[in-house]
């Protein structure tokens, strides 16, 4: 009788006008109630009836009223809904279509759904993975939540789900772009390609690599210096900035690398065949020649030019590494000509590595973790591949080539696509100086650390320390690497300028730099110049690709390690993050990340302290763990729904002996000096 009473509505409005309002974010619990988080220190209880009008993550305005002598929040206005486009799983209730969001805090929701026009509801089964859109929300005046399914990703039990679901979640493609029937060479009429087909270039790649985009040649000169030539595949010979394929490449940004598979940026017929620097096949290439002094210094005779080249040998990392490290390889016996090229490339790479160790920054060796999959997409094994001699040889060649490109673009145009890093965050510099002063770092004043040379010197000093604790500590004070169109320094590498051009099959920014380098060769205005937005676009692509790579890996780790808690398998793990709730570690055997809550280290809040600022964990005020430490752990939980691992140390910390106990009990003979173990 009161439902449509205008007087009652008017009274309710007057009451609400007198109530205070707060803006905040909804945090749901798994028990029906929630909280309105206004800031880090202020939150209000949201009773279950009010939670039915909102969901976890919604930004809302709420009335703050008193009920049962307690302040509670009643959401009244939606500022921003947490769900718009999302990934979910089909739930069928009495034959009716519902969707449960694939989100740890929202999985228990079951939202009524319908399919968009053109999709058949009969094609959807329990547990199927879908892309859905929240189209109705109670705080928008709707009766309830309602979603529309726009796309079916895959069936409930399809083992390809980790890849397809993750790609859909990040709105990324799951296949390469379509090729065209007849690729045509579109060189500028004035571009002359030198004939280098007789020069014995070699490619060094993984055994299964098809998109071979770099070929190398080096010759050690009588005075000990090295004549180096780097040849790079040339997709911009076939794709102009006006072509539709260029727009596709820009929209993708990079080839997407996921565990066990990749999604190429360019069509495979171009990347794996026409542009790939295959053995004994003539290919157009963009080349750089330069002299590297025997002390590793890059000479001033940098020359970029276009050429037709031919790879004389398709080599494999492990075979070359075996041959260089042991003198022979069971799988590969080079001709004397190729052997000499490889020896000279190796000697060049050692000269450059030695220079970097004293003038720039050398990154510590860490394994690349590689998932081996069966034909059915099951994980067969997880390999920890260390960077070997041949990998370093190619890496030094590519870094040298990119330094040469950076210098050339800076001098010729003053712009390009540059990888940059600004060193320490300005607002954190005082913290860095204080931390380094306490630990005896030389020349670690703010003025010095604000230079590339000073930053690099500090990184080299940190690399000489017995542990990686300090190195881990200062990482959070560092800026993020960026991509931009200005020639700024790359502090993290210890370089004044750095512009990549060595992977144009896989990186759109490298395609832009190819066009700029061709303009430099021709002495003409560039056919494409990088605008202000290109760097932001590429950085955003890279961010989404890394998230996708990590999410697929987390899913596969959870699937692969599901039985390990029951087996109580022991793992060596390295601490890479410490915060108030506990610490995060990486399993050295396979690269999986696990969380170790403080309560599983020692279930006594009075005795344990997890200090995120110092990167330490203390028990009874004594440091027991710190960043960079390696410890033995077991997994206690593998949550396949959330794709997360929880573990605990195998080390057990004893209970404190009470004063009463120690005063009434006599110590055993000869044990007077023994103290309880922390």
From Swiss-Prot:
Pfam family, any one: S1
EC assignment: 3.1.13.1
Xref: PROSITE patterns: RIBONUCLEASE_II
EC category: hydrolase
Subcellular location(s) of the protein: Cytoplasm
One Gene Ontology MF term: exoribonuclease II activity
Keywords for this protein: Cytoplasm, Exonuclease, Hydrolase, Nuclease, RNA-binding
NCBIfam families named among the record's database cross-references: 3_prime_RNase (TIGR00358), PRK05054.1 (NF003455), RNase_B (TIGR02062)
Family recorded in the similarity comment: Belongs to the RNR ribonuclease family. RNase II subfamily.
Protein name: Exoribonuclease 2
Annotated organism of origin: Vibrio cholerae serotype O1 (strain ATCC 39541 / Classical Ogawa 395 / O395)
